[in-house]
Amino acid sequence: MAVKVMITDDHSLIREGLKQLLELEGDFQVIAEACDGIDCMEKLKEQIPDVLLLDINMPRMNGLEVLQKIKDEKIDVKILVLTVHNEVEYLLKAVDIGINGYLLKD
């Protein structure tokens, strides 16, 4: 059974590249893509993936705000943060809110 994934990133090339990599692996199914935090939260109301790949720096609602909303609404999803931010403060905030992994885009 494939792991259901949602990709949330404001860059369409990043979303498309991640989708292609995951689908080539074969054990993953990208069930949704979101271009910002608000879009992500709307799509989470429709269906909950097993894993959410989440960018931090996005317009309208950033990834840390999405993390807090997910925690507040008690949405059961594993979250991997993908970001260019390598500053410790972002990692600590994300870990404090509750993430399952933190990957740098470098």
Regions flagged by a language model, labelled:
Residues 2-14, 18-22:
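Conserved acidic segment of CheY-like receiver
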Residues 8-9, 34, 52:
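Conserved sequence signature across two-component system core domains
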Residues 9, 55, 83:
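Active-site residues of response regulator receiver
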Residues 36-39, 62-65:
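Acidic catalytic/metal-coordinating carboxylates
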Residues 58:
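Receiver (REC) domain active-site loop signature in two-component systems and cognate sites
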Residues 27-35, 43:
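Short hydrophobic/Thr-rich beta-strand motif most characteristic of the beta2 strand and flanking loop
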Residues 47-53:
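Active-site beta3 strand of CheY-like receiver
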